[in-house]
Regions:
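SIR2/sirtuin NAD+-dependent deacylase catalytic core
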Residues: 1-173
Length: 173
C-alpha cells in the first residue's frame, strides 16, 4: 500500500530498506547547517542514494521524510544543540519543512506508529509537521502508560490514541 508521506524520526535506514524494491519514491533528509553557507535545510535523494532535485519530490508517489537526518545515504544528522537551535528558531514559520510535505499534509491526517512523544523536540517537530494538516490524527500506542506530557500533547493536536499491539494490528491490515 503506497503511502504519499512517511515521516521517519529514527536515524537508521530501516524504512529506506523497506522501500528498496520500489522506484517511485524519494527521501528528504534534514541536514546539519554547520558546514552550509547557503540557506539549505534538507536534501533530497532518489532510491539509489543519489542527490535529486528538490522539485522532483512532487512527482514521487511516496516521500520518505526524515527531519532529523539519517545514516543513509549520506550520513546527515541533526544531533547537536546548535543544529536544533537553528531549526527551532525557523520551524514556527515552516522554513525547515519541505514544500512537498506541506502540500501533502493539506488534505490528510497523520498516523503515528512506533514513536513516543516523551521528548520535547519530537513533540515540537510533530506539532509543526502536522500544522495546517486536515486531520484526523491517530497515535498507535502499545500497552504502556503515557506520560503527562504525551497526554497533553495528544489532546492539544486532537489525536485519538489507539492502544494495540503493532504487530497484531499490522497483521489485520
Amino acid at each position: 500500500m503506497p503511502l504519499p508521506l512517511i515521516v521517519d524520526v529514527w536515524y537508521d535506514g530501516a524504512m529506506r530498506n523497506a522501500l528498496a524494491g520500489r522506484t517511485d519514491w524519494l527521501e528528504i533528509q534534514g541536514i546539519t547547517r554547520a558546514l552550509e553557507i547557503s540557506d539549505v535545510w534538507y536534501r533530497t535523494y532518489d532510491p539509489s542514494g543519489a542527490v535529486a532535485a528538490a522539485d522532483a519530490a512532487h512527482a514521487a508517489r511516496t516521500i520518505l521524510y526524515k527531519p532529523h537526518g539519517s545514516v543513509a545515504p549520506a550520513q546527515n544528522y541533526l544531533v547537536a544543540d546548535s543544529d536544533y537551535v537553528e531549526v527551532v528558531t525557523e520551524i514556527d514559520i515552516q522554513t525547515p519543512i519541505p514544500d512537498c510535505v506541506k502540500l501533502i499534509r493539506e488534505s490528510r491526517g497523520f498516523v503515528f506508529v512506533g514513536c513516543r512523544f516523551n521528548d520535547q523536540m519530537l513533540r515540537t517537530y510533530a506539532r509543526q509537521i502536522i500544522k495546517r494538516s486536515r486531520g484526523p490524527h491517530y497515535v498507535l500506542v502499545e500497552n504502556e502508560p503515557l506520560t503527562r506530557n504525551e497526554e497533553k500533547f495528544f489532546d492539544e493536536i486532537g489525536a485519538s490514541v489507539v492502544r494495540a499491539d503493532a504487530q497484531a494490528l499490522a497483521a489485520q491490515l
